[in-house]
A protein has these predicted regions:
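Structural signal for interior beta-strand "rungs" in well-ordered beta-sheet cores
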Residues: 19-205
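Terminal amphipathic alpha-helical/low-complexity segments used for targeting or macromolecular assembly
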Residues: 1-24, 29-30, 35-36, 72, ...
Length: 287
């Protein structure tokens, strides 16, 4: 994800764009707003903020220090962007929040800037962050991601491109979610979610490959079947994780999908979710 540098935007002063900015808005003199940024009444934009061309900021929005917002974003009333992180170790470091082009941030979303761990919180392009969701410090959210209403994403989480969180999901800190994964509403996510799969039930478990989502993204039937075969080895063949990965590397052709899945699982810090069993215990949120 990249945010267009502000020096590529036409130089704009508040005097030039005052027809787009309501007089009952406060904008710090050092904030940089590109052409055609529209700001509705009672919003506050702090210093060290950059907003790209064509972005709309609704009423009663607070955009705090370190925000870097791309082009054509929509920020709905009540949102708070780039607030200080809720981290007791934070000592006022100069950190930022990056939001990619064409991202929509709905009502009362809160997004916190980074700490010295990553120095930034990053949200990709074309994302939809629905109402009352929270993205904590140092998260890396890919492009085309959807966080449904009241999703709560703790610090240092990584969400891959095209990931979807159902409403009221809670994601444990340092968790990773692979690209094209779908997580059902109300889930507690404490283990890593590999790419291309669905996760559901309690405790959160493997629920099959996200075939519908992959078809919508243009994956061929052959490629989807290849991914299904990979996950049959991981979850249905009776092998432990190490054995399954070795089997995939020895017996399956080297494809981008195979290599991505194997690498994701091998590098998982929290371990991946398991196949559902009636004897499962809720260990997903245990440290």
């Amino acid at each position: 994800m990249s945010v267009t540098p502000m020096n590529e935007y036409p130089a704009t002063t508040l005097k030039n764009v005052n027809k787009m900015i309501h007089p009952h808005t406060y904008i710090h003199p050092n904030a940089k707003l590109a052409t055609n940024v529209k700001v509705d009444p009672f919003s506050v934009i702090h210093q060290n903020v950059e907003i790209g061309e064509g972005t709309w900021v609704g009423s009663n929005v607070t955009i705090m220090e370190g925000a870097r917002i791309g082009k054509n974003c929509r920020i709905f009333p009540g949102a708070v962007i780039s607030a200080m992180p809720q981290d007791l170790k934070f000592e006022g470091e100069d950190t930022i929040t990056e939001i990619g082009d064409n991202t929509t941030i709905r009502e009362f979303v809160t997004i916190h800037r980074g700490t010295k761990d990553r120095w930034k919180t990053k949200i990709g392009k074309n994302c939809m962050i629905m109402a009352y969701s929270h993205v904590a410090h140092d998260c890396i959210i890919g492009s085309n991601v959807i966080l449904s209403n009241n999703s709560q994403v703790a610090g240092h989480v990584i969400l891959g491109d095209w990931a979807i969180l159902g409403g009221m999901c809670a994601v444990h800190q340092f968790t990773k979610v692979g690209q094209h994964a779908f997580i059902s509403g109300g889930s507690l996510v404490g283990k890593d979610i590999p790419p291309y799969i669905k996760a559901g039930r309690q405790p959160l478990s493997y629920a099959g490959v996200n075939s519908v989502g992959l078809k919508r993204r243009g994956f061929t039937i052959d490629k989807i079947n290849h991914i299904l075969d990979i996950y049959r080895v991981i979850y249905n063949k009776g092998l432990n994780t190490s054995q399954a990965l070795e089997y995939l590397e020895e017996e399956f052709p080297a494809t981008d999908e195979r290599d991505e899945i194997v690498t994701f699982i091998r590098e998982s810090g929290r371990g991946i979710i398991k196949r559902y069993s009636k004897n499962s215990v809720d260990e997903d949120i245990a440290d």
